[in-house]
């Protein structure tokens, strides 16, 4: 955390990062508990949506988020968004998420209450390898590598699910198995027109390529270390918890904004049957999307919820990135508030 040269700086309870930034064990506890909250939301919200799901109304015209994603994965619903037979598959997914959230919560409590607050104090040699040193690029790249590999395997799970089980293809109105297409020329070309992609083979091919890049990059970061002397040109003095947080916020903010535009317009990854018709982009104080079909007052399609929520989350994540990036560079925001509060008593002296 930025202290502006004052080693005795204290933070209020609301500055949660201040309590874990330099204590890697507590840092892991916070991350595991946060993951548990996310997984709990997924399970609980699936049950909530299932309890409110109306089979007489098209799924795309209901304010749903979790159920349409399950439908695109070929779980629980037919091509018209109607429950197939019973709710057991959907209930099973929700319960697995709830149980997993309990395991993650227990892991968070374990790291918070019983295990060392700092991994440097751990009796396990492998655990000490993951002790965070913010201005040590070798430590950070080692930890980053493991994150990238885990993300790569998560992407592989999606690709293999589509290949073995199948996903919903709006082109034929049914769930089908999708073999990924590793045509590198196509993947390269879709960098500029990915919002218009209309072929599931290309979608899965892009994900397969992404998995390869993530796992290869992860292995590279684990195996390699800083070449030569660690200088200011390479980031010495810049690497900090605040800087890493700012970069993380920039990444997730950018992804959220891309997801907003993609979910608003693409009907292959976000089928009309499950998410509703494509949206119309409007501008006011900020951009926003509106439904292009007539719906009762206060009712919005899944697509409208997804696009707008992702965009505004992304927008504020980017603001958080700028805030923390400036703090990491040493900018003191208190100077701004002090300048504003003293504006009435400020004097201007003119010199000849």
From Swiss-Prot:
Pfam families: PSII. Induction: As the light levels increase antenna complex levels decrease. Transcript expression level is unaffected by iron concentration. The keyword Transmembrane applies. Belongs to the PsbB/PsbC family. IsiA/Pcb subfamily. The antenna complex functions as a light receptor, it captures and delivers excitation energy to photosystem II and possibly to photosystem I. The Prochlorales pcb genes are not related to higher plant LHCs. This high-light-adapted strain contains only 1 pcb gene. This is Divinyl chlorophyll a/b light-harvesting protein PcbA. It comes from Prochlorococcus marinus subsp. pastoris (strain CCMP1986 / NIES-2087 / MED4). The lineage of its organism: Bacteria, Bacillati, Cyanobacteriota, Cyanophyceae, Synechococcales.
